Each structure stands twice: as C-alpha cells, then as structure tokens.
Amino acid sequence: MKKADNEHLARMRVEYGSVEKDGSADLDVDWLADGWVALLRRWLADAEAAGIAEPNAIVLGTVDAGGRPVTRTVLCKSVDDTGITFFTNYGSAKGEDLASTPYASATFPWFALGRQVHVRGPVTKVSAEETADYWSKRPRGSQLGAWASQQSRPIASRAELLDQLAEVTERFADHDTVPVPPDWGGYRITAEVVEFWQGRESRVHNRIRVHDGRIERLQP
C-alpha cells in the first residue's frame, strides 16, 4: 500500500452528532431502567426500522485451542434475560473453538445509527427442543444447505458443494420435513457483561456497561 493510501486511511472518520437521528438525548443509565434486554430489543427495532441489512447480525469472537482470537459474522436468533443465542454447525471452526474455550463475545454493529452493543460471557449449547423449534422456522433451502455443508472444511470447488446439495435435496425429496442434522444446533452466550455504545462529537462517546447487576458509565 502506498504512503498516500495510508495517509488517506488515517484521515478517514465520521463525526457523530450530538443527538440521535430520532431526536433522543444522550444515552444514560436511566435508559436501562427496564433492564438491558429491553434496551437491546429497542435498538434492534430501531436498526430494522432504519433499513439496516441484517440488523440482528453479530460479530462473534472466539479463541482457538492455541489462544488465538477469531471473529466472524453470524445472526443472533434470540434475546432474553439469560443472554443471546445463535445457531451453527457444532463441527465448524467456531464450534471447535467453543468446545475448547466455551467463552465468547458478540457485537451488534449498527454503524449507520452510531450505535453498538457488546455482549460477552460463557457459552453453552441450547437444548435439543430449542434447536428443533428454531430449525422448524428455517426455510427448507437453508435446512438442506445445513445438511450439505461440512462447515469450515476444505472443498475442491463450488461445483462439488452444489453436488452435495443436490444429493441431500434428492435424499429428502419425499420428506415433508427435513430433520435437524446431528451436528447442528444452538449456542447461548450468557450475558456476563453487556455494554451499550453511542457515538458522540469529538470522540467523547457514551458507554454504559451492565455487569454483576451494576450499571455504570465508562470513559470513552
């Protein structure tokens, strides 16, 4: 990369406003009067209303067996008082990471709104019943895709992957419902720490953290 390119990157920044686009005031501890779940759901609804693509997308952080951090984007499919839930192949790279170190972080990045929410804590698999309930809501094509893909494993070509999809499509052609793969299911990140972030002028951002029942403001 040329020096001029780096200089351009160094100058790139967005100046956040002093109020939200909906006219609301600065994020403060009283916004969490009804708990962190209520505020997270409100911000999710705001992101959806703003037309943000996949507003429930989270950047999921894990560490591998060697202690090296890895991130990727997945979709949050449930929020409740215990934490947030996502679903995946248990044999995937993230599944292997969580088997060796069952702890993760997740960030909802709503850049267009100048907002982020960060959740971290221990991770456990959800029950088979909870997995089956979510699985039943997935489109059939997504169900077949989960059977066809040995997630995170190398494959010679896309054509080979499509051949695998065609094979499972034929296998389940006479089935009214597609069963849950044995190596597929949900994980719940128990919300040990939740932080709400709101961009503000001159990088003097608002940060409110919920931890061990305490709600506290953090310096930016």
UniProtKB/Swiss-Prot annotation:
Pathway: Cofactor metabolism; pyridoxal 5'-phosphate salvage; pyridoxal 5'-phosphate from pyridoxamine 5'-phosphate: step 1/1; Cofactor metabolism; pyridoxal 5'-phosphate salvage; pyridoxal 5'-phosphate from pyridoxine 5'-phosphate: step 1/1. Its cofactor is FMN. It catalyses: pyridoxamine 5'-phosphate + O2 + H2O = pyridoxal 5'-phosphate + H2O2 + NH4(+); pyridoxine 5'-phosphate + O2 = pyridoxal 5'-phosphate + H2O2. PROSITE patterns: PYRIDOX_OXIDASE. FMN binds at residues 72-77, 87-88, 94, 116, 151-152, 197, 207. It is an enzyme of class 1 (oxidoreductase). Its EC number is 1.4.3.5. The keyword Oxidoreductase applies. Homodimer. Belongs to the pyridoxamine 5'-phosphate oxidase family. This is Pyridoxine/pyridoxamine 5'-phosphate oxidase.
